[in-house]
Design a protein with these regions (language model features):
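Short, functional N-terminal and low-complexity linear motifs
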Residues: 3, 32, 87-90
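C-terminal catalytic histidine-bearing segment of alpha/beta-hydrolase fold enzymes
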Residues: 72-156
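The feature captures the conserved acid-bearing segment of alpha/beta-hydrolase catalytic domains
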Residues: 18-79
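Primarily recognizes the serine-hydrolase "nucleophile elbow" in alpha/beta-hydrolase
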Residues: 1-26
Length: 156
């Protein structure tokens, strides 16, 4: 996705592929070089999350991302004890470990580590996309926080 010029706020959540190579990245060498070059050239930051005991998204995989992206890779690891202990059946029976930080294993409580991760992702996206929107919008266009006039609304 980061090869796509429109992707300006890359977030990697529990990347688990390839399944048979815990330290591998599911990307060709050519694409990996292009991603690393783009991230460096454009000053992008890549935000990533995983649980510490995740057997599908391992520390080896995060290390591979760090090797590829250097300091632009912000890999954050949550303690597996913070995961929702009652995930949906697929995650309980097939995945079998804390894996999906902001979905199946999210604990919807203020201040909880998984909610903090979710809030960090939202803040990252808002900051990155807000910066882009400021650069892209014309001076006569409303800000995102301003109501957008509806040209189809009838006059009062």
């Amino acid at each position: 996705m980061t090869l796509e010029p429109a992707a300006i706020a890359p977030v990697v959540n529990h990347p688990s592929l390839p399944l048979d190579d815990p330290g591998g990245l599911e990307i060709s060498g050519e694409d990996a070089a292009a991603v690393a070059e783009r991230v460096a050239r454009e000053g992008l930051k890549v935000l990533a999350y995983r649980f510490d005991n995740d057997r599908w998204c391992t520390g080896q995989r995060f290390a591979a991302y760090r090797t590829l992206l250097g300091d632009t890779f912000d890999g954050r690891v949550l303690n597996a004890e913070a995961a929702n202990t009652s995930p949906p059946p697929f995650f309980r029976d097939v995945v079998g470990c804390a894996h999906s930080v902001v979905t199946a294993h999210l604990v919807d409580q203020d201040g909880h580590p998984t909610m903090q991760a979710r809030n960090e992702i939202i803040a990252f996206l808002a900051e990155r996309l807000g910066t882009w929107a400021e650069e892209e919008r014309g001076h006569d266009e409303p800000r995102a926080s301003e109501p957008v006039p509806n040209p189809h609304a009838s006059a009062p």
